[in-house]
Amino acid sequence: MPSTPLSATVEALSEDAAQARHAELSRAIERANQLYYNEDAPELTDAEYDALRQELEAIEARFPALTGTTEASAGVGAKPSEKFAKVRHAVPMLSLGNAFADEDVDEFVARVRRFLNLPAEEAVAFTAEPKIDGLSLSLRYEAGRLVTAATRGDGEVGENVTANALTVDDIPETLSGEGIPEVLEVRGEIYLSHEDFAAINARQEAAGKPLFANPRNAAAGSLRQLDPAITASRPLRFFAYAWGEVSEPFTDTQSAVLERFRGWGLPVNPRTKLCRSAEEMIAHYRAIEAERAGLGYDIDGVVYKVDDLGFQRRLGFVSRAPRWALAHKFAAQEAITELLAIDINVGRTGSLNPLARLKPVTVGGVVVSNATLHNEGYVQGVGADGEPIREGRDIRVGDTVIVVRAGDVIPKVRDVVIEKRPADAVPYVFPDTCPACGSRAVRELNPRTKKLDAIRRCTGGLICPAQGVERLKHFVSRNGLDLEGFGQTYIEVLFEAGLVKQPADLFRLEFEPLKAAIVARREALSAQRRTEGEPAPKKPTKKKGEEEDKAIKNLLASLDARRTIPLNRFLFALGIPQIGESTAKALAKRFPDMPALMAALAAATREQAGRDWLELSALPRIGPGTRDRLFETLDPLPGEAMQDLSLGARLRGRLTPSQREAVLAHYGSEAEADAALERAASQRPGDAYRLFADDGEIGPVATDSLIQFFSEPHNDAAVRALLEEVGTEPLAATTSAAAFAGKTVVFTGSLEKMTRSEAKATAERLGAKVSGSVSAKTDLVVAGPGAGSKLKDAEKHGVKVVSEDDWLAMLAEA
């Protein structure tokens, strides 16, 4: 069965489901950005990351109110690290749109021509240059001298790495030549050659240090060193390809800019070509692809840019990318080798991640000995949608496998050479307990597909050491307990020192052990740097020590200030799957405190619905209402008594023709459908379960997740231990104002005096409902600059429209 197109999947989402999926995608993208840009340790392939981005943008296209409400939606890259001073880019460093097929390039050229409204006889020139797989860097020159070097960061704010950039031979400290603008921001890429990368890893291995996974990670890690001497010891290279702020125009085409750069002493890629058609662009792409292995450095595609800068200005930008540029990505590189073993790593969110141990093989110039196998379903030959992949071929130890490096970053096993499978190879059996903590590992019901998730997860939650640090970071985060001063570093220090293993431990901290852990971490880092031949950090001065003591006391004070917590924040902070902020708030509306909620959940657990009941509820044209009416009585109805029918057949006969069609399509035959209906009849949930599951703001998926979480004894014990240290309080009552209570409000355009999430929260606090679309039921539209189709919809339906200032004035009167 073909997979459902993305557009159809998004079209089927309700507003609440879209908001939940948008939040889920945003979290995944933000984590991927953090790993890629700040930790130089990406987990996703380019294709996997692009798929997340495409789905996020599709949801935002249908629900525009969600645009800009998360970091993933509003920006590119990741927040800059706390290790470096911040630099705000005068002109944001944006990302590029992607092309994966020749047809995408044809469409790009056609789209540019349509936007510019050019006659058929007028040609448009494009530059085509290799896309370097490195770290983006912005160099600010004033009066020809380098004054600041900054990483991309989140696109708006980057990290100040000036001292490190000055050690890179390719980066001139002073530009030379004629016509240099007074202010010139040069954008480019830091990278390592294959030869230099191999030499660095050889030195790492000789020193007993971890090897870098690839040249991109090594280049990024080298540039983002606190000690410039380390950066200077690594032979980093640089290519310039773009610009940010300039004090005055200095040419009128992209190709001329690159020539100027070259003349001023900045290195530019020699394989850049000027093309005048999509055919020429694709031909150059093919030529560079053929040369790729011999270039001596990593590239992952070709970037096309409209050459005429006047055209570039007219084309402008859309979302996070320019309309006038496109990145044409290369297909993955492949090799064949033997699968020696399958190891299981436990991820930071509890996922059991299979890792292939391979007979070493060279893929794209890099020796690969490990590769991802994604998840249990992938190993079994089943996709995320439950449909077969690789024609159903599973992956077994001893198999000959095809390994790919997608995007020149993460190797993965793509397929099995089934003809070479050993006779004694047996299917791999995934563990059903967590190798890190021994808790049950389960596959959850996917709320979108209504099928078992492809990923098996540890249920140990709060006590699993593999998840511990990330769970604790989530617990103290701004949307959790919002513990002031408790950054990621403190959590890592406390966890490694054994002082904090679960949330309750935070509230048992004392001054002396906390200080000792911080001092021990500092001394360990000093010893490590001395071992590596690097200068150790200076010992803190008396004044610095006093400031450190004060900071520790402030941490303890912030903990004491959180010993009474709103129930919704407490629930969200626990990090229970499927319990986001909205669901946590819904639960907090219905229960006064945590003990009351836990008692209700215990009763719900005893009356939980069975699998067939839940599966039936999710079928098209059935739903909870039809299901409940269907099972109101199991006794024969008038007209059924005279027929010698089984219970399942009687129940099937009560369905409408379209409902019967849906049931038969799902179960495959009347016999299977009747058997499932009979099983469902015996699996009906009790009232205690339905109190949660039938609630529109909670639902069966979140209910089952809550039950599963608290059914794990370790989690139940951890929450009870936490409740000995803190108390929960009811959700603050909604403040209703006559102007807003029960009203439906829509925000459109840019809000300049508050974020969209702030505006939404304020409206909801005053008793209003915030919607993503305008209809006849909408009461008020708040329109900022750039408002589009929603204004027309408001006029069509006669809905009142106010400005952001009007809205703020209304709030002041409420």
UniProtKB/Swiss-Prot annotation:
GO MF, one term, reads: metal ion binding
Fetch the Pfam families from UniProt: BRCT, DNA_ligase_aden, DNA_ligase_OB, DNA_ligase_ZBD, HHH_2
Q: Where is the BRCT domain?
A: 735-814
Name recorded for this polypeptide:
DNA ligase
Q: Which CDD domains match?
A: BRCT_DNA_ligase_like, LIGANc
Q: What is its EC number?
A: 6.5.1.2
User: Could you confirm whether the keyword Zinc appears in this record?
Assistant: yes
One cellular-component annotation, GO:
cytosol
